[in-house]
A protein has these predicted regions:
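A short N-terminal helical cap/helix-turn-helix that marks the beginning
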Residues: 408-410, 414-431
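Short, hydrophobic beta-strand segments
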Residues: 168, 240, 341, 388-394
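Extended active-site and interfacial segments that coordinate phosphate-rich ligands
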Residues: 183, 217-247, 296-323, 356-373, ...
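Active-site "cap" helix and flanking loop/linker of ATP-utilizing ligase/carboxylase catalytic domains
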Residues: 246-276, 295-349, 431
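Glycine-rich, charged/polar anion/phosphate-binding loops
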Residues: 184-185, 197-198, 208-211, 259-261, ...
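N-terminal beta-alpha lobe that positions the nucleotide/phosphoryl donor
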Residues: 1-274, 278-302
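Glycine-rich active-site loop/lid that clamps phosphate-bearing ligands
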Residues: 326, 331-385
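Short, well-ordered alpha-helical segments
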Residues: 392-410
Length: 431
């Protein structure tokens, strides 16, 4: 087992990893930027190393600085968390080449699933159902327009290297296609440095279903059932739940089997999520659920899976990265009850939900609910990072009870962020 773990991240996920490390007897090392010098993850860790200025490009995205911090602090392993460098195959390889344990999948697996067109081709070859669409190398406007006509409108244009809701355009008719394509390509080039796109049939009544998978270094893969992340805002998840409502056992078996097959296709090691899109116009059916992409890291919404299975996914990550076999076989895994997670953002609803910055003057959360956060009252909310400040997770015997518990939180969550330059901004988390 590793002895000293550096967490190449910040905020709530860094704090969450540190807690599991402490519980399992592993020392933790935090990294921090100028803006995060007094952050909660720095205060919680056994040691902390400064890695650069506040901008992520000069700190949390500096793989060389992070590896140097690990070596300087005596860490023998690096956990990337999610976001930042967590799905960067070159960083993963550099960590391994430096003689450190990489808490994540093999760089080749990250690379294989990193480009959406290649990933879909690989999945189709492995027998995993994929969304009808175009993933060809010919990116000429005429070829793409012709492919869209063959798929049938509406279609979705997606950046091959996309993510986080960027580089996506829904197109209703052929007359709109050319301008939508140009807009999508411009955004993709600016955000990812790659303007290539793929086309998918747009599902008019979509459900976003994802399956948690885990693989070890001995060729074993299991699934930990599904999550539903259909409630989104600007293509980003807002409320997640597990299991998925309306999922019968036959459909669950089919989608989970497809997810395990996908993981085996890339010799997957560690925590991963296979994302599917379902056409729910006639209910959830196995023949109307298609592979969308694979996230080769821990997901933001992993706590809902932990709540229904009783498994600490971060502990599994640490054990598997250390060379252990999966702690449980598929037959030993089961779930009970229902879990829901809501994300709490420091945003100002009076100003188009723009991020609120300043001092977190009030941060009162209810007892009896799992809270994952990277801040405490008195901490600074800066403009440099994602405005998500906490996740609230509830569990109940049924979906109705879990939803009721989540909705009641509205009366017990009080957050005030004071922006001294622009006056006070109140954020009330409404469920």
């Amino acid at each position: 087992m590793m002895k000293r773990l550096l967490i190449a991240n910040r905020g709530e996920i860094a704090c969450r990893i540190i807690r599991t490390a402490k519980r399992t007897g592993i020392q933790s090392v935090a990294v921090f930027s100028d803006a995060d010098a007094g952050a909660l993850h720095v205060r919680m860790a056994d040691a902390a190393v400064h890695i650069g200025p506040s901008a992520v490009s000069e700190s949390y995205l500096r793989g060389d600085a992070i590896i140097a911090a690990a070596l300087e602090s005596g860490a023998d392993a690096i956990h990337p968390g999610f976001g930042f460098l967590s799905e960067n195959a070159q960083f993963a390889k550099a960590v391994i080449d430096a003689g450190l344990i990489w808490v994540g999948p093999d760089p080749a697996s990250i690379e294989a699933m990193g480009l959406k067109d290649a990933a879909k081709t690989l999945m189709a070859e492995a027998g995993v159902p994929v969304t009808p669409g175009y993933m060809g190398a010919d990116q000429s406007p005429d070829t793409l327009a012709a492919a869209a006509g063959e798929i049938g409108y509406p279609v979705l244009i997606k950046a091959i290297a996309g993510g986080g809701g960027k580089g996506m355009r829904k197109v209703e008719t052929g007359a709109e296609f050319a301008s939508a394509l140009q807009s999508c390509q411009r955004e993709a080039k600016g955000a990812f440095g790659d303007d290539r796109v793929l086309l998918e049939k747009y599902v008019t009544r979509p459900r976003h279903i994802e399956v948690q998978v885990f693989g070890d270094k001995h060729g074993n893969v299991v699934h930990l059932f599904e999550r539903d992340c259909s409630l989104q805002r600007r293509h980003q998840k807002v409320i997640e739940e597990a299991p998925a409502p309306g999922m019968d056992e036959a459909t669950r078996a089919a989608i989970c089997e497809a997810a395990v097959k996908a993981a085996h296709a890339v010799d997957y090691v560690g925590a991963g999520t296979i994302e599917f899109i379902a056409d729910a116009s006639g209910g959830l059916r196995a023949d109307r659920i298609w592979f969308m992409e694979m996230n080769t890291r821990l997901q933001v919404e992993h706590p809902v899976t932990e709540a229904i299975t009783g498994v600490d996914l971060v502990e599994w990550q640490l054990r598997i990265a250390s060379g252990e076999t999966l702690p449980k076989s598929q037959e030993q895994l089961s779930f009970s009850g229902w879990a829901m997670e809501a994300r709490l953002y420091a945003e100002d609803p009076a100003h188009a939900f723009m991020p609120s910055t300043g001092t977190l003057e009030i941060f009162e959360l209810p007892d009896g609910v799992r809270v994952e956060t990277g801040v405490e009252a008195g901490d600074a909310i800066t403009p440099f990072y994602d405005p998500m400040i906490a996740k609230l997770i509830v569990h109940g015997p049924t979906r109705a009870i879990a939803a009721k518990r989540l909705s009641r939180l509205e009366l017990h969550v009080f957050v005030k962020v004071s922006d001294h330059a622009h006056g006070g901004a109140f954020v009330h988390h409404r469920l």
